[in-house]
Every structure is written in C-alpha cells, then in structure tokens.
Amino acid sequence: LSDKSNQLTLGLTQIEMRKLELARAMAVKPKLLISDETMAGLSSSEVDDILKILINLNEKTKITIIMIEHIMRAVMGFSERVVCLDAGRIIANATPGEVIKNPAVEKAYLGE
C-alpha cells in the first residue's frame, strides 16, 4: 500500500481497504487480532492474498488470530483449531480435519 500513501481511502479498492484495516490493527502491536469477515466479498485471488498476509503475520509476530469467517477454504487452510457455531450453539471444537468430518457441521452448513 506504500504507493497509495498520499491517496484518500475513498479511492482504495476493496482489497486495498482490507489490507489497510489489517495494517491499522497491527500498528499498535496487539497480542490478539480478531479478523471479522475480513474476506467477505473478495475474489478467490484476493482471499488468497489476505490469507498470505494473515499467515505471515502469525508466523512473524506469533500473534493469536481469531478468524470469524464464512469462507471455509480460508478457515480450513489457516486455522489450527476451528470452532463452529449453529444458531449460537457450539457444534464443533476441533482441528480442521476433525471438523470437516463432523456430521453436525455437515448438517449445519450443507443441510440434510
């Protein structure tokens, strides 16, 4: 985003805004980052870009990242642990591999 440093945020694209939001959050060196639907509305390649940024942040800073997300590819590719909710109730709390095989998760997300 350094090439956009003199530009108003109104002129930024959606992916640039998401990157700016992450940069602003990280500027205060938090111990915890909550990513709430950061990837909503992004294209597949933009989701990949955000995932790379989050993975890089996690590896370099060892920050804990809580991801609230509906893009399962992103959740499963990023997370060490996944907690799935259905109607506000926890239906799974396990590794991505275990969660993806959980019948309650399949029912909640794909229907019967």
Predicted regions and their residues:
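Glycine-rich phosphate-binding loops of nucleotide-dependent enzymes
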Residues: 1-112
